[in-house]
């Protein structure tokens, strides 16, 4: 955490001011610290020492007392416990923490210091580096605990003095009490503000005196796992008052501010370090210097910005404070969990405290908390981190002590450095040194020279003293060697005598034990012999009983053999009789075969008649299919005629339209010629032309009505033809197979859909014809052509796809035909109703056109003045209409011709497909007939071996079965002998046959096992007293065992 910690002995100079040089040099003349008393044992050093954690609770402040704020914290100083009351989900829950020491709100500064801090000061004087830092929320008394109240003018320590002044006073009291000891103290005061290090003891430069600017310091690694602050000012102090002045000087420079939680809140972390050097003499007379360091850290408190009221710069300060404290908490967690990575480098605070947390420094944490309920969350956080910090282990080590020669060398290098500074100041070539410092350094040099001279004199005296002590030591060593030789001889003789006595006692004990073992073996052998005799008598009785039972069993076996011989002869006789009966039964079965042959001949005749009937039915089916083909051809031809009529009507309609358009064009030309001669004549001609157009449109409407009537008649004729076709199909439906019925059903559905689409097309044409005559005819022809093509293509595809499935779907044709009849009739009625609706719509359109004509006459009167402009537009319009109408009419005629050609080719293709389908049907029927004939032949060849007279067989079979039953009952029921009980057969009983294991158990165990059991059964008391008893009483005689 500090530079002295990392440098250890190399940073210690003389009792005067230590130079602020950053040079490090290795020393080969260190004295091992283990030569002096070390309060840390080797075991403790290896395992580590837990950080000491102390909790202090502040009392309520005036504001909290005025508001009567409830307390949530209870401190038990005796049990060292802190209990926090929480209200979670309406339940009162207490959380208890256990710490090393606990100080309640009523505790005094002196109590905390004497119980917790005072032992640490003694460890610092023993050569350890120790750290004490206060941790907690802002406003909980950290600075008060570390620094306390203002010092009295007379220099006495006030009652509310904190840890720092009391520790300083204790150090000087102890050092001054050791009058013979020489010592020196150095202090440094460091501030960490917004992650920048500042030396609070550095002298301020004149030009920055007004704004109190503070130069930031650099934090450097020392290469040994520690850190040091480059350029940190260290002041030599010789009295406690000087330290108090230094403390007041640095505290005045610390950054503080007022917040809602604290009137004087510290906005930075501060580290006050006291370094002590004490000179000691070794038993060899060598002068060494031991060093210890006390770091007193006052951390800025964590705060909630919303509660503290921090804004802008204060908010940034609070953020930096919370960030560094959060990193400190993460370091504590990582150390407790023994994590592989400890985030020391994430904050300068944790880098400075690195040796205090998990390092070689003894550390004490004073956690300050508030009892107020408003600070419950912060209090719990502080207590949780403090409780975790308890488990952090440090491995404190005593600082290495420096020999006098090392100090002398450092002093010489310091003198050389000071000489260079003086020379540079004299020549004005270097760094300026203040007069006060120059005077002080000169005085220190003189004092140092005097001390060096004094040390040399003392060194010579010590050398003489060491020589005298060495001579005394050598003489004492000679006397001790003579006494040690005599003692060794006496001890050797005593040892030999004791060994001889032990050998004799061992031999006597072994002899007594051997006699007891032999007696124990003999007693076990006699016991085994007696057991064997008793067991042999029991086995002799069991053997006699078994012999009697065996004789009775042999007698019973003889009786059973006689009965078995008689039963064997009886069974042989029964077998011969049974064979004779079975032979008779076989003869009767053979006689019945001839009768069954006659029955099978009759069956063959029946099959022949079946085949002939099947042939006649096939011929009838073939004729029905021929009639079906003729009817189908008739329907297709009628469709062809309908299409031809439709084509003729369309051509005539188009020709009429063309003539009307031509007439209309001529009339327009004549009318416009008349207009050029006279406007009045033009108006009359226009009116007459309009009348002519009205008449022609009426005639055209009547013509379209007649055309639609003819189309409706054609549709009705198609419906009549289809109805006749369905009636004819119904008469032959029962004679057709499954194949023809389904194909015709599909064709009927296709024709029905075609008729429906055709009627819908006619209705649509009637609605649109009055609006656009030429465009309607062209689209009508196109739709008609498309409908016919779709219908013909569907019929063709249906005929080709359904031919293969006719043999599986024919049975459902009759029901489908009847349902289609009903649907066809309904379609006819619906088409007629649609025709009537269309006629009424045409009449309405006619009335609308008449109205429009009247309106046109009225408009013509108002357009007389604009006839010149309209003449040119009408002429152009006439030309465009004539050209458009001609192109439309020619396209319609060409489309009708193509439609006629495609329709005829489709009909011829359909007829050829139907012929091929009929041929395939007839071929399949012939194949079926041939298969029936083959099946009849196979049946005749199979049933020939099965002819037999079943009636005679049944009669003879019954007689033979009755006779066999009678013989079986006589043989097995009356003549078969049974073994009767004589009550002389011995009953089953259990024999006590000894097992191999039980026989083995009767054997006497081996001598080794007996001896082992003998030794195991001896009690501790017998083992202790047995030898003495045997020696005094002797062994018992063997006759007593027998």
Curated annotation (Swiss-Prot):
Coiled coil spans: 480-517
InterPro entries referenced in this protein's UniProt entry, alphabetically: KIF11-like (IPR047149), KIF11-like_kin_motor_dom (IPR047241), Kinesin_motor_CS (IPR019821), Kinesin_motor_dom (IPR001752), Kinesin_motor_dom_sf (IPR036961), P-loop_NTPase (IPR027417)
Signal peptide region: none
Residues that, per the record, bind ATP: 136-143
Boundaries of every Kinesin motor domain copy: 50-392
Predominant place of localization: cytoplasm
Compositionally biased spans, kind Basic and acidic residues: 21-31
A molecular function GO annotation: microtubule binding
Biased composition (Low complexity): 1-14
Region (Disordered): 1-45, 1021-1042
CDD domains documented for this protein: KISc_BimC_Eg5 (cd01364)
Subcellular location: Cytoplasm, Cytoskeleton; Cytoplasm, Cytoskeleton, Spindle
Polar residues composition bias: residue spans: 32-41
Phenotype caused by lack of the gene: Radially swollen roots without any depletion or disorientation of cortical microtubules or cellulose microfibrils.
GO biological process: cortical microtubule organization; cytokinesis by cell plate formation; microtubule-based movement; mitotic cytokinesis; mitotic spindle organization; unidimensional cell growth
Domain of life: Eukaryota
GO cellular component: cytoplasm; microtubule; spindle
Protein keywords: ATP-binding, Coiled coil, Cytoplasm, Cytoskeleton, Microtubule, Motor protein, Nucleotide-binding
Role according to the record: Responsible for microtubule translocation. May be important for the organization of phragmoplast-specific arrays of microtubules. Plays an essential role in stabilizing the mitotic spindle. Required during mitotic cytokinesis.
UniProt similarity note: Belongs to the TRAFAC class myosin-kinesin ATPase superfamily. Kinesin family. KIN-5/BimC subfamily.
This protein's name: Kinesin-like protein KIN-5A
The gene coding this protein: KIN5A
């Amino acid at each position: 955490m500090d530079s002295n910690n990392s440098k250890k002995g190399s940073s210690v100079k003389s009792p005067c001011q230590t130079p602020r040089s950053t040079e490090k040099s290795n020393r080969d003349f260190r004295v091992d610290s283990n030569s002096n008393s070390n309060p840390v044992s080797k075991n403790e050093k290896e395992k580590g020492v837990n950080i000491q954690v102390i909790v202090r609770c502040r009392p309520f402040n005036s504001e909290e007392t005025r508001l009567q704020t409830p307390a949530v914290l209870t401190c038990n100083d005796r049990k060292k416990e802190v209990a926090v009351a929480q209200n979670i989900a309406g339940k009162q829950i207490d959380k208890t923490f256990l710490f090393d020491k606990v100080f309640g709100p009523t505790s005094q500064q002196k109590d905390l210091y004497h119980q917790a801090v005072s032992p640490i000061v003694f460890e610092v004087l023993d050569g350890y580096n120790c750290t004490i830092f206060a941790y907690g929320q802002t406003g909980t008394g950290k600075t008060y605990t570390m620094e306390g109240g203002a010092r009295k003018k007379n220099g006495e320590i006030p009652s509310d003095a904190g840890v720092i002044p009391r520790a300083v006073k204790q150090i000087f009291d102890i050092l001054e009490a050791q009058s013979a000891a020489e010592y020196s103290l150095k202090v440094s005061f460091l501030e960490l503000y917004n992650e920048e290090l500042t030396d609070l003891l550095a002298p301020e430069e004149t030009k920055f005196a007004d704004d109190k600017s503070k130069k930031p310091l650099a934090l450097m690694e020392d290469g040994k796992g520690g850190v040091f602050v480059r350029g940190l000012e260290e002041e030599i102090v010789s009295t406690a008052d000087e330290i108090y002045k230094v403390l007041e000087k640095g505290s005045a420079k610390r950054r503080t501010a007022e917040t809602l939680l604290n009137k004087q809140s510290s906005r930075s972390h501060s580290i006050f370090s006291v370094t002590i050097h004490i000179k000691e003499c070794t038993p060899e007379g060598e002068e060494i210097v031991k060093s210890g360091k006390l770091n007193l850290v006052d951390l800025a408190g964590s705060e909630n910005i919303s509660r503290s009221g921090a804004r802008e710069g204060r908010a940034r300060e609070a953020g930096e404070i919370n960030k560094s404290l959060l990193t400190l908490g993460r370091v504590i967690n990582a150390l407790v969990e023994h994590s592989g990575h400890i985030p020391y480098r994430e904050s300068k605070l944790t880098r400075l405290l690195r040796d205090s947390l998990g390092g070689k420094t003894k550390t004490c944490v004073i956690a300050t908390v508030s009892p107020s309920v408003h600070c419950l969350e912060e209090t719990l956080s502080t207590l949780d981190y403090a409780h975790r910090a308890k488990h952090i282990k440090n491995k404190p080590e005593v600082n290495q002590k420096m020999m006098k020669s090392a100090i002398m060398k450092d002093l010489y290098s310091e003198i050389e450095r000071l000489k260079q500074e003086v020379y540079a100041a004299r020549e004005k070539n270097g760094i300026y040194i203040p007069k006060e410092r120059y005077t002080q350094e000169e005085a220190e040099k003189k004092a140092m020279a005097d001390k060096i001279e004094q040390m040399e004199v003392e060194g010579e005296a010590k050398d003489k003293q060491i020589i005298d002590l060495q001579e005394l030591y050598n003489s004492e060593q000679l006397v001790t060697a003579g006494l040690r030789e005599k003692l060794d001889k006496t001890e050797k003789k005593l040892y030999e005598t004791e060994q001889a006595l032990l050998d004799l006692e061992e031999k006597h004990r072994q002899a007594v034990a051997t006699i007891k073992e032999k007696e124990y073996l003999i007693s076990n052998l006699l016991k085994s012999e007696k057991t064997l005799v008793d067991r042999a008598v029991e086995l002799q009785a069991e053997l006699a009983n078994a012999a009697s039972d065996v004789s009775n069993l042999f007698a019973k076996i003889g009786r059973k053999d006689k009965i078995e011989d008689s039963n064997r002869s009886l069974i042989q006789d029964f077998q011969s009789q049974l064979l004779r009966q079975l032979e008779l039964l076989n003869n009767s079965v053979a006689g019945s075969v001839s009768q069954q042959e006659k029955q099978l001949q009759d069956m063959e005749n029946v099959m022949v008649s079946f085949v002939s009937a099947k042939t006649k039915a096939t011929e009838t089916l073939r004729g029905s299919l021929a009639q079906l083909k003729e009817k189908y051809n008739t329907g297709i031809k009628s469709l062809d005629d309908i299409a031809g009529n439709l084509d003729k009507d369309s051509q005539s309609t188009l020709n009429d339209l063309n003539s009307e358009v031509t007439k209309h064009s001529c009339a327009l030309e004549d009318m416009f010629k008349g207009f050029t001669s006279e406007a009045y004549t033009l108006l009359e001609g226009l009116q007459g032309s309009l009348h002519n157009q009205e008449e022609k449109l009426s005639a055209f409407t009547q013509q379209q009505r007649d055309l639609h009537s003819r189309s409706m008649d054609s549709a009705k004729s198609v419906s009549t033809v289809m109805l006749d076709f369905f009636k004819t199909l119904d008469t032959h439906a029962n004679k057709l197979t499954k194949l023809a019925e389904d194909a015709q059903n599909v064709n009927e559905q296709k024709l029905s859909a075609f008729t429906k689409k055709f009627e819908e097309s006619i209705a649509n044409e009637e609605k649109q014809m009055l609006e656009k005559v030429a465009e309607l005819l062209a689209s009508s022809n196109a739709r008609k052509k498309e409908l016919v093509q779709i219908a013909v293509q569907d019929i063709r595809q249906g005929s080709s796809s359904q031919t293969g499935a006719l043999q599986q779907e024919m049975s459902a044709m009759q029901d489908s035909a009847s349902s289609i009849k009903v649907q066809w009739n309904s379609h006819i009625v619906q088409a007629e109703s649609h025709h009537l609706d269309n006629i009424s719509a045409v009449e309405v359109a006619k009335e609308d056109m008449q109205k429009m004509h009247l309106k046109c006459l009225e408009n013509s009167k108002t357009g007389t003045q604009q006839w010149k402009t309209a003449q040119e537009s009408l002429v152009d319009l006439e030309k465009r209409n004539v050209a458009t109408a001609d192109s439309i009419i020619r396209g319609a005629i060409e489309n009708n011709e193509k439609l006629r050609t495609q329709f005829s080719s489709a009909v011829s293709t359909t007829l050829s497909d139907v012929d091929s389908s009929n041929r395939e049907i007839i071929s399949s029927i012939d194949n079926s007939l041939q298969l029936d004939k083959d099946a009849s032949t196979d049946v005749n060849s199979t049933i020939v071996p099965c002819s037999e007279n079943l009636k005679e067989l049944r009669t003879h079979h019954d007689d033979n079965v009755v006779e066999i039953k009678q013989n079986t009952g006589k043989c097995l029921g009356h003549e078969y002998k049974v073994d009767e009980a004589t009550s002389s057969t011995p009953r089953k009983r259990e024999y006590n046959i000894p097992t191999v294991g039980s026989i083995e158990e009767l054997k006497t165990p081996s001598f080794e096992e007996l001896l082992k059991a003998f030794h195991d059964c001896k009690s501790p008391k017998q083992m202790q007293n047995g030898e003495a008893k045997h020696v005094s009483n002797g062994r018992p005689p063997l006759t007593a065992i027998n």
